[in-house]
């Protein structure tokens, strides 16, 4: 904007009437400029006091003067008339160009006006100073807000008072003002709402109102937001006089909620004083805070709230926000109750919950879900986001108006855990946004025993939220009404702008980290003050009694009423005989299981398809279904090759995946594929999103053009995050069993940055929380000389975490043995060697009557390997996933002549067959591929061993001996054959790194393992 600098510029010859007419015609509604009135010719240096953001106020006055010179103070009238006449705005500024003789006479006639200029300059400078003062409070007022309920610490680590905040009258000198200016009246700029209906206020009142808005029990951080509308919205919410008013009914409701929150913790302390419960004492206001957010969101149309939180206060939230039956909570404290045979279970302050009820404030139905989580702080954040995104997707809530998420955090974890940053950066990505999350930080100003000054480098624990321009509302938790107002504004912000917002509840922790911990060892001064601190319930009750809102008997009756509720629930809890984890399910799947939670059958239909369907999908996969769409020439060749494969009734890896996905879409199964570069594929094999070479950002997804009324296909390149994105996809898969949700690592090696999600959620999730999940992990794996970080998906780690017993041979004659195995396992681990088998295992994942995580070690070089092809015949009706692919060559025709039976999995099979052919040993060595590693195919492998009675057994792998599959396979193979024979090893030696970075060394190691595999005398010295 040109701002008022142009006032001192040389003017076009306009009459006053022409000036007003031009202004009224051209003045924009929001952004204003003088460009349509003046020629901007004066250099900026000539009028520095009129430049920058300080010009806003002068600009307002100037527009008012143009419309009616009498509407402004006489001093402003003098200033603008002098400026328009060409007089210099001050002795410090350069004069404009000389005036024409006619204009000079006009200046002469206005002599008294020019003489008044020095006073005008002072007035303008004072007004600009006041505007700067207002802005200083808006930017830095939170630094001096009274946020710590203990009054001994600063909520931010920077304890210095900003120089531009008026903490004493001598600070007025910073702005060129003094005490004599305090009673002067100043016009208020449009960037503040402290005036309410008044457009001007005395300086004393301006400072008082700014202190009330920004320096009391609420500190607002928002001026880093680069959106004027959003900043103005926040200013209005916190600056408008009298905006934080509550009715007596609202105050009574707040008191009742505080009673429930406080008395619940006290009840648990009385009954189980020696039990860990991670109570909420010191931040009891959290419960009414959450209920306020939910109430306001429900009022704005939200009917489903998904929550995630750590252990602190979790039982209280379950009881008083989610409304879990109190007796079910109390049962968790009974050490005599036996657990149902449903899994290993989890501690009570990790459990989740799902509940649908009526919101009493809005009288609307609302569903509340608290996601179960491990002790790993903040790990559940992306899981909650993913589940929220899924629920929005399934109900068509494209703007987040029906489903929302609330995340609770601790101050130390919010600042310290990197997953918080990863999750924030998903918040505005098109395929990951949940259209705004309300974050509530329980800031008890300590992390276990660690002082905040040792726990973070930023002033506040919430500073990470600034990266996504989320407003941050700090509030003193001992002021319940301030907390309620902030939470109401947070809910309104989310409803209005659909962006993240943070509420920082600055509180304290009355006990130690848990109820058994002694905090005085490390925080003696803090806890001396805490011992003196009056509980917030008592403070607020005394306030309301003094205000006449309630009387003492009413308050005591509220306490007695809730105490009675707790006692009655405690009595009912004694009737419970067994603990059921299923009572704590956070993501039920209505209709998928029987009423008692069992699969509706224990069979799986054929995963094959008719040739017509295969051909149709293949034709779409090899074409562009949109007209006037120009694809890359190289991609044209790829599609042409696909078309030729389809004509030859053959599929490669990319086509097999396409056919599996396309057929499930036809059956109404939503498919979501996510990960880094998955749209094209890291190895440029997938190409599920086509890009027009002539039109920027124009894309086509052929998979969404397969069938009329098909389910939608979502394929989305993720941010460069594994931990956050895998957690997100896990949460997405929680919402419905009728979706195939896949996460692909760029290379399998990189999954370990998401190890927490794998170790704490995917592997033990069902055992801990009775929560099935069908997520699929695609992990590119293979030793191909690409170095230690592009070779191994660490299969040994996944296999180590499988829950089957290597020393126990199951009942192989059991009906539906393979399905029962799948039902009993904690996850399925496969390494397919053919595209056809890959096709089948993807389809089986949905056709099974239950859900298990599926870990697939996918190939890299096999994607284009000429032998890694499957015929349509392997994918027709009646076919299915092959857990084991037996030898089908000459060795199988004469099994008595076979000297060695090699077991392997994955890509190494093609190295072995090539070497066997080169050595002409096709009749002496049989090769059996184990495609499904877990659950282990005992039954099929026993048949293979019995087929070759004279053969010695060896396991061959390309991975190092202490890695890969050997330590998992060997004991199970030995159990299969009742330890009748040894199982030898042919592979690389043990190593610390997964692979060498030297190509020659890689090839040498490969040849050595092949030599061992086909040297029939290799193991004689070990017999």
From Swiss-Prot:
One of its GO terms (molecular function) is oxoglutarate dehydrogenase (succinyl-transferring) activity. Ca(2+) binds at residues 143, 156, 158. GO terms for cellular component: mitochondrion; nucleus; oxoglutarate dehydrogenase complex. Keywords: Acetylation, Calcium, Glycolysis, Isopeptide bond, Magnesium, Metal-binding, Mitochondrion, Nucleus, Oxidoreductase, Phosphoprotein, Thiamine pyrophosphate, Transit peptide, Ubl conjugation. Disulfide bonds: none annotated. It catalyses: N(6)-[(R)-lipoyl]-L-lysyl-[protein] + 2-oxoglutarate + H(+) = N(6)-[(R)-S(8)-succinyldihydrolipoyl]-L-lysyl-[protein] + CO2. There is a cross-link at residue 534 (Glycyl lysine isopeptide (Lys-Gly) (interchain with G-Cter in ubiquitin)). Residues 1-40 form a transit peptide. The mitochondrial 2-oxoglutarate and 2-oxoadipate dehydrogenase complexes (OGDHC and OADHC, respectively) share their E2 (DLST) and E3 (dihydrolipoyl dehydrogenase or DLD) components, but the E1 component is specific to each complex (E1o and E1a (DHTK1), respectively). This is 2-oxoglutarate dehydrogenase complex component E1. It comes from Bos taurus.
